[in-house]
Amino acid sequence: MHYTGPVYRPPFEADSILVQVTVGCSHNACTFCTMYRGTRFETSRMEDIEADLREAAHDFPSVKRVFLVNADAFVLSAGRLATIAEKIHEHLPNVETIGMYASVKNVIGKSDEDLARLHELGIDGLNIGLESGLDEVLAHLNKGFTLDEARTQLARLKKAGIGYSLNIMLGAAGSELWEKNAIANAEILNETQPSLIFTALLHVDPGAPILDEVKAGTFHEDTLGQYVTEELEMLKRLELEDTVFYGLHTSNVIPVSGLLPRDKDLLVKRLENGLARIPERYLNSHPEKGYEGMSILR
């Protein structure tokens, strides 16, 4: 398989075959992210993609789902994605759906007809980094889109039949705005009704522009207690019809997962109980962060 540079996938795509169709990230300018900072954006050659599909067909002929990598494979033109999808079905006839990372920006350039065609070819379950329901936070993170643009493009995906999961970054607004952020996150999630919500904490890595703000004291990270309370207050306000809540990223202080609305009360109770068990000395602290933002309590 052809993989260039770092390769990431959502944890819930563990059973999917990863096929590289782009290298790096076409945006690569979010102030919190260093995942692809040293990787030049490129598109994969079709012959390499087909070679990988032949290899996958030999090793995993019964696979049901393919996840296209890297950072925002949906940036490819609708025509290119359609060709790739057709080749996937040719080499892997048991594949039912094809997912990938996508940005709101990637959807804007595709017509309603493009989206409908891609849906017909099995493209479904896009993973989109929304991060926050506040425009001021999206601008600060340099996501490259506004909340209104997100609303419009997510509605277009839904109309075309393309499902999506949304990533929410707890702590993205900083410690002064955590409550406002929690409320705004719940509002946009209730409006868009994603198939899955993936929560993780903001973790400031070396090389990220936002780290300079933290060092200068112009951006204040959530405390450990605020991270949990922000997630809890967001969860309490969620009114969803059929959405997986996936709070199992390694950075999450208290891992929770379930189906909403069925498990809402259970998840709220787990967060409340977990918060009550955290020693007071940690609640107002900014713990050291380890791998992928895991809190290290000493």
Task: List the model feature ranges, each with a label.
Residues 1-13, 190-298:
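Auxiliary Fe-S-binding modules of radical SAM enzymes
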Residues 4-48:
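Canonical Radical SAM [4Fe-4S] cluster-binding loop centered on the CxxxCxxC motif
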Residues 17-19, 64-66, 96-102, 126-128, ...:
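Hydrophobic faces of well-ordered beta-strands that scaffold small-molecule active sites
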Residues 25, 33, 49, 68, ...:
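Conserved, mostly hydrophobic/aromatic
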Residues 49, 81, 111, 150, ...:
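Aromatic/hydrophobic pocket-lining residues that form the small-molecule binding cavity
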Residues 58-160, 239:
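Conserved SAM/AdoMet-binding glycine-rich loop
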Residues 105, 133-137, 157-181, 200-206, ...:
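Conserved strand-turn element in the central/C-terminal portion of the radical SAM core barrel
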Residues 110-115, 174-191:
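Catalytic cores of alpha/beta
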